[in-house]
Every structure is written in C-alpha cells, then in structure tokens.
Amino acid sequence: MLTRAQNTLQSILKEIGQEGIPIAKTWRLNERHYGGLTGMNKTETAQKYGEEQVQIWRRSFDTPPPPMEPDHKYYDAIVKDPRYANDPKPEEFPKFESLKLTIERTLPYWNGTIIPQLKEGKNIIIAAHGNSLRGIVKHLDSKLISSMHQTNLLIKLN
C-alpha cells in the first residue's frame, strides 16, 4: 500500500500493456516497520544509538528496533492513515518489527491469497518492499536464514 510499491507496479503494468487489470493492495506487504527510528535518516540514527546498534536492528533476524510510542512525531499520521481504516485491526498494527515479525505479517497474505491464485494457474505480479520480499524468500528457502542479512533482492523483467 506504500507509494513506492504502487508506483513501481504502475510502471510495470504500463510497460506490459496491462494497466486495467485488477490490483489487490494489502498492508501485509508494506516495508518493515522501524518503530521509533521512523523519520530518522541513517546518520541521525547512528549518532543517537551508535552505528553498531543500528546495524543490529537493520540486519538482525529477530532483534526489533525500539517501538514507536504514541508521542512519536509520526505515530498519528501512520496509525490513523485512512488506508488502514479497515485493516489492520488496532491490535495487529505493528509498533516496530524485526525481520522475523515482518515475515509473520507477510505470510498470512502469501499463504492465504497469493498461493491459492498461483495454484489456480494465475499470473501474479508482486510489487512490494525489500524486507517483506526478503521474508517471503526466507520462507521459500529456509536455508537463507543464516545469511539473510547479506541478501539483496534483484528484480528483472524479461
């Protein structure tokens, strides 16, 4: 549902002449929620918490950043965003995420929506974000868990 993924999808659809096809949007494929780090660039984050800690948060499988508290500058803008009026439920809305938590968020959509359509023989384009895609890749190949922090995703259309 985030703008970058939507723009990427529109570019792809235009290029392949499929601009009128149905599009499903879900918060479950959003980028990882960096919690209290949201809105800070890498330099600011490193100055406040130290470069080593920032790398742990960014690349660790199961270590989340600090949570986004209700007094955070962007809390209301995110939690009350009209795109999320119906989904996720308030108790499901993440306040922070590790890669592990991101996977737990993406897999219900993968298993419940994408896989059934693939089994029906449908062609699917997934326009999402790096960490949500990393989570799906990890699910597809559990051997990657030990090197997940080194995984860069490349997308190519032929």
Locations of regions flagged by a protein language model:
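Active-site-adjacent alpha-helix immediately C-terminal to a catalytic or transition-state-stabilizing loop
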Residues: 6-7, 93, 100, 104-158
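Phosphate-coordination/substrate-recognition cap region in phosphate-metabolizing enzymes
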Residues: 1-76, 84-85, 96, 137-158
